[in-house]
């Protein structure tokens, strides 16, 4: 992580960006990057070697975590950290990756001290007002707090019902369809997919692995 930070920092400076370190600890660096009046925040972190998928190669950022691993990490962060960014990232993951109940299962695979139900009750309390969101999201006004809170409340209510029907012995796995893509159906549809063999409960491991498609 330190090597990546050093190289990225030098590259950004070389391209005329101003880099302001916001927070720095041994395994994590957060910096604000500014140029021509525009700014964004970038984070460098040292992640656990345990994950569901191998690292994904990206033309811009080099290597990144698979979206499901990122979403699982954000859920774990939301349990113990009060950052509006984490909450918004989880909401975006629900919208773009898969329903909350499946992301909870994956997150518990990385943090076995939780079950989907117990983790849900921790994160269900999270909500932020417009001022809190605008302070950490640049530019301000990108997200509407009222809309986010309504969406979050609905998803938490849905997940509370879903965890009751989710297979307990599969908690901690990543739920994929038969093609190895994130499963996005309802829990009732999951039950049907289990019976027809159209779902994969993919387990995490050191350095991750791609699911076996049969």
Residue ranges and their predicted role:
Residues 1-214:
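Compositionally biased terminal segments of proteins
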């Amino acid at each position: 992580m330190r090597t990546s930070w050093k190289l990225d920092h030098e590259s950004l400076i070389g391209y005329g960006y101003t880099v302001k370190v916001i927070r720095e600890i041994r395994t994590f660096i957060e910096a604000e990057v500014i140029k021509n009046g525009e700014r964004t925040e970038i984070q460098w972190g040292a992640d656990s070697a345990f994950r569901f998928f191998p690292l994904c190669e990206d033309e811009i950022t080099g290597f990144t975590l698979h979206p499901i691993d990122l979403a699982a990490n954000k859920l774990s962060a939301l349990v113990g950290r009060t950052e509006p960014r984490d909450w918004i990232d989880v909401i975006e993951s629900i919208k773009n990756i898969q329903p909350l109940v499946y992301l909870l299962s994956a997150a518990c695979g990385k943090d076995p001290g939780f079950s989907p139900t117990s983790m849900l009750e921790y994160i269900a309390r999270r909500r932020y007002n417009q001022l809190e969101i605008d302070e950490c999201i640049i530019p301000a006004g990108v997200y509407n707090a009222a809309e986010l809170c309504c969406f979050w409340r609905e998803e938490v209510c849905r997940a509370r019902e879903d965890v009751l029907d989710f297979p307990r012995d599969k908690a901690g796995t990543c739920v994929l369809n038969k093609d190895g893509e994130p499963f996005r159906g309802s829990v009732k549809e999951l039950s049907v997919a289990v019976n027809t063999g159209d779902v994969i409960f993919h387990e995490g491991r050191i350095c991750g692995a791609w699911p076996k498609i049969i």
